[in-house]
């Protein structure tokens, strides 16, 4: 079957097939090479891109902005105070207006339904920059980083440590299953992934041959791992749960002891950032004062170690987002994948 990207939205990882995701990862590597060599790639010349942000961001905003400019497009940032999604104006009406003015729309916010409505009613490609359920553009950056380090994806083992119910755990479990990557969720039972997410991932794993594991046993989780991945213990909007999460997730911290348990000297560490690995922020100092914790989901030792690839990963947000925008909006000759 012929598969084309033009005009399509990217709202969740399951929107694209395995072959399409692999194509986008390889296309990202190509665009990264062009960028490094200073070769222009203005595939979106004259296009206007709306960047809608209900949730604040450093990497997603910077990546979409620089990617759009590199592609020759004009990005327009609309923050939480600039848009009325569901407040004074329905998401449907907002989508219809923005679709008349912009060629593509990025949305970063809380509700998956909102990004779906934007895609349904705008008439232009919509890209999910993060919702409470999924983080698809992050996945392309993550698996590009993994492929850069190992030269392949299929058969590798990635372990996610921490809150197994958040959007990162959802996305890693499903995307890994699609791509044939073995995914293990190392989490307390109280925070195991939702059953519907697990069932979805298992359905993809049957096709790809990926092996999935959800466990609270450290030895079982990390043995032979190629990638250890973690994220913040408290997601945006859940700040009231801080004390509970610190107590619950302390045993799931990524530290050198956990890395050594993996028994793989070529292991890499990933984090989607921001990371609470020290107290060099106002937030970090506040956490230390309230809970007596100087390091949270990852120790400073690991974060600054030779295993760490989180800044390569952050850079790759730009290259992978560029690939998605170019493929879905650039009228490129991609007849099938």
UniProtKB/Swiss-Prot annotation:
Pfam families: OTCace (PF00185), OTCace_N (PF02729). Pathway: Amino-acid degradation; L-arginine degradation via ADI pathway; carbamoyl phosphate from L-arginine: step 2/2. The keyword DNA-binding does not apply. It is an enzyme of class 2 (transferase). Carbamoyl phosphate binds at residues 57-60, 84, 108, 135-138, 272-273, 317. It is found in: Cytoplasm. Gene3D superfamilies: Aspartate/ornithine carbamoyltransferase. It catalyses: carbamoyl phosphate + L-ornithine = L-citrulline + phosphate + H(+). GO terms for biological process: arginine biosynthetic process via ornithine; arginine catabolic process to ornithine; citrulline biosynthetic process. Belongs to the aspartate/ornithine carbamoyltransferase superfamily. OTCase family. Reversibly catalyzes the transfer of the carbamoyl group from carbamoyl phosphate (CP) to the N(epsilon) atom of ornithine (ORN) to produce L-citrulline. This is Ornithine carbamoyltransferase, catabolic.
């Amino acid at each position: 079957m012929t598969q084309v990207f033009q005009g399509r939205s990217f709202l969740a990882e399951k929107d694209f097939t395995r072959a399409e995701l692999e194509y986008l990862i390889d296309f990202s590597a190509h665009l990264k090479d062009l960028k490094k060599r200073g070769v222009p790639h203005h595939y979106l010349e004259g296009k206007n891109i709306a960047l809608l942000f209900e949730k604040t961001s450093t990497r997603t905003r910077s990546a979409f902005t620089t990617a759009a400019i590199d592609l020759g497009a004009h990005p327009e940032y609309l923050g939480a105070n600039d848009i009325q999604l569901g407040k004074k104006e329905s998401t449907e009406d907002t989508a219809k207006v923005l679709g008349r003015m912009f060629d593509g729309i990025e949305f970063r916010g809380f509700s998956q339904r909102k990004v779906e409505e934007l895609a349904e009613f705008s008439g232009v490609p919509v890209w999910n920059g993060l919702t409470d359920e999924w983080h698809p553009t992050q996945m392309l950056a993550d698996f590009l980083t993994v492929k850069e380090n190992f030269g392949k994806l299929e058969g590798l083992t990635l372990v996610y440590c921490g809150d197994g119910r958040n959007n990162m755990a959802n996305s890693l479990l499903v995307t890994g299953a699609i791509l044939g990557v073995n995914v293990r969720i190392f989490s307390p039972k109280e925070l195991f992934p939702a059953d519907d997410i697990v069932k979805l991932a298992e359905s993809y794993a049957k096709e790809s041959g990926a092996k999935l594991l959800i466990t609270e046993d450290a030895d079982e989780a990390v043995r032979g791992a190629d990638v250890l991945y973690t994220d913040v213990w408290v997601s945006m909007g859940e700040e009231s749960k801080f004390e509970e999460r610190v107590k619950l997730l302390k045993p799931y911290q990524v530290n050198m002891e956990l890395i050594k348990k993996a028994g793989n000297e070529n292991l890499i560490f990933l984090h989607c950032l921001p990371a609470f690995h020290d107290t060099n922020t106002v937030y970090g100092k506040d956490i230390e004062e309230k809970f007596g914790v100087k390091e949270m989901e990852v120790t400073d030792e690991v974060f600054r170690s030779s295993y760490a690839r989180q800044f390569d990963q952050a850079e790759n947000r730009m290259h992978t987002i560029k690939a998605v925008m170019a493929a879905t909006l650039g009228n490129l000759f991609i007849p099938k994948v």
